[in-house]
């Protein structure tokens, strides 16, 4: 029974991962409307209205997925950008001293937030794929002032468990 449950879970995750590229391909910057974006991606987890009337829609795929999408709808109601936030360039922008809000702006909602009381730190983790065959974790450690202390990249333990490592 547990094997069947694992197979069904894996199939569902693969199906979800396979849907996003098709959704992205159906949308075009400067052409697609907010309604079309919501038809493809559903309701966003967060909506931020900017001073000029533009909207920023966040679609995190964490904790089970490997992407976080941020879609901007311009004041004209058309999609002006669609970005996947979890990539090396954004990870490189995270440096000591950044505040939690700045990190969330760069990477979107984390997969996991883990307090480490004895160290007086909090760790945020994001799952990502550096290539199609690997899953890794990008971790950001915050001090008691909610500022970045350091970052780290490690292998995804969930992937290792599935592989029987």
Model-derived regions: residue spans:
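Sec-dependent bacterial lipoprotein signal peptides
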Residues: 1-17
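Residues within mature, well-folded domains
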Residues: 19-165
């Amino acid at each position: 029974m547990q094997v069947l449950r694992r197979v069904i879970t894996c199939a569902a995750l693969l199906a979800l991962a396979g849907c996003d590229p098709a959704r992205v391909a159906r949308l075009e910057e400067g052409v697609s409307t907010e309604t079309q974006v919501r038809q493809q991606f559903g309701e966003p987890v967060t909506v931020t209205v900017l001073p000029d009337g533009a909207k920023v829609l966040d679609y995190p795929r964490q904790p089970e997925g490997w992407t976080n999408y941020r879609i901007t709808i311009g004041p004209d109601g058309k999609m002006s950008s669609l970005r996947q936030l979890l990539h090396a360039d954004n990870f490189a922008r995270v440096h000591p001293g950044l505040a939690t809000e700045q990190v969330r702006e760069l990477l979107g909602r984390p997969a996991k937030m883990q307090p480490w009381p004895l160290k007086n730190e909090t760790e945020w983790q994001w799952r990502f794929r550096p290539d199609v065959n690997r899953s890794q974790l990008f971790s950001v450690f915050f001090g008691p002032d909610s500022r970045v202390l350091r970052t780290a990249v490690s292998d995804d333990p969930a992937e290792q468990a599935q592989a029987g490592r």
